[in-house]
């Protein structure tokens, strides 16, 4: 039976690759259309930046202890492992007259709107349903918040996969255009990050919408609510302008496929069978991606909490002065993330030329992972310096100007490896899948699984690990530094180089 099962899995893999293959789109689309679709990333990332910088502290203010807050982030990888491969699979086969990708992108925007409402009004609805304001734990608000948080992760996964697959369709198999498209996507992610983190660091944003501040919703909550209003407005503008401007050709299955349609439904056993029988370049890419994101997720999920706790010495569960210090640290962390995103945006624009000068995409990715390793290791030095300063100046003194400068420099420099991480792995996945005949949506969905698995590992382990060492964030950051170094070595040694660029086509010059 083992041989038969292996043969069946191989057939499933072949079927998935063949049926997911994008239609022959001809020549690559003009750069202006690629830029238009890539701009959707700004709207998506605005909300994601708010989620990363403000929601971990906010859930603690609603009453979830720090050591349990990491489990909240399990929503993301679980929904990512389920949603994005399904969306990718079906967007490869969608026969809608609106195209393959656009219906899923529009559905994702609708889900974002619902989730933003639930998150922003969680405290108000919880109070209406019976939460007592004097209670430390607001159970109903937490349930509503977590529901919205889950929906937001589902919405982001519904949006991002088809967006990247749409870009790959527009590149039409041209390796250089594919890298440029992903660099544009990374650039607009940086734009969204800058806007999101800037909004999150501004303490009086709620004055734009005075109604956001209520009896159950204090200034921090009102600022959060206002930020999400701005987020959904931007997302609606960029998404619908892009979907109106860039047409998505209606797809029809090749002759003979219609009869097999009912037998080729998506099952997770088949997709994991496809992973087992993927070509070596894609397998190596998935391995390096898993280890790389084990390095990234501790910092991405807990950077603002680290600023509030370890750097500023605040406590979300402490007295009013400790809470105020914690909030100041969170806002400073959002400002640091804004600096990070500014550099990320500039680096994204130069990924193509930097990669050429460094000898290729895989060498560039490998080298910047060592920058990530050094940066994460430096969090130990920053934390110890902040603790030493508080021993001298007092527990509520806050960090010195020198420590603040060091922290902001650290946040900024980490924008370099993050720009590469947001671009090169996705470009390589598109290139490898094109060469093997696999569909863009399915391949990017599988890559998303390689990103979700590390987040699950970090979410499960970081809380208990940090609790074993006193409740801070440093143990997870140190593990991340080690993983970053390992991923750098693997990227340089085992990851295959992508094939040469596709030859130029007569229609590839439509850049005006």
Swiss-Prot record:
CDD domains: MFS_SLC45_SUC (cd17313). Keywords: Cell membrane, Membrane, Phosphoprotein, Sugar transport, Symport, Transmembrane, Transmembrane helix, Transport. Its main location: membrane. The chain crosses the membrane at residues 34-54, 68-88, 103-123, 141-161, 180-200, 226-246, 282-302, 334-354, 364-384, 407-427, 441-461, 474-494. The lineage of its organism: Eukaryota, Viridiplantae, Streptophyta, Embryophyta, Tracheophyta. Disruption phenotype: Significant but transient reduction in fatty acid concentration in developing seeds. Slight delay in embryo development. Residues 55-67, 124-140, 201-225, 303-333, 385-406, 462-473 are extracellular. The modification Phosphoserine is found at residue 20. Residues 1-27 are annotated as: Disordered. Inhibited by protonophores (e.g. carbonyl cyanide m-chlorophenyl-hydrazone (CCCP)) and SH group inhibitors (e.g. p-chloromercuribenzene sulphonic acid (PCMBS)). It catalyses: sucrose(out) + H(+)(out) = sucrose(in) + H(+)(in). Widely expressed. Expressed in the endosperm and on the epidermis of the outer surface of the cotyledons of torpedo-stage or older embryos. GO terms for cellular component: plasma membrane; plasmodesma. Residues 11-22 have a biased composition (Polar residues). Belongs to the glycoside-pentoside-hexuronide (GPH) cation symporter transporter (TC 2.A.2.4) family. It comes from Arabidopsis thaliana (Mouse-ear cress). Disulfide bonds: none annotated. GO terms for molecular function: biotin transmembrane transporter activity; sucrose transmembrane transporter activity; symporter activity. Pathway: Glycan biosynthesis; sucrose metabolism. This is Sucrose transport protein SUC5.
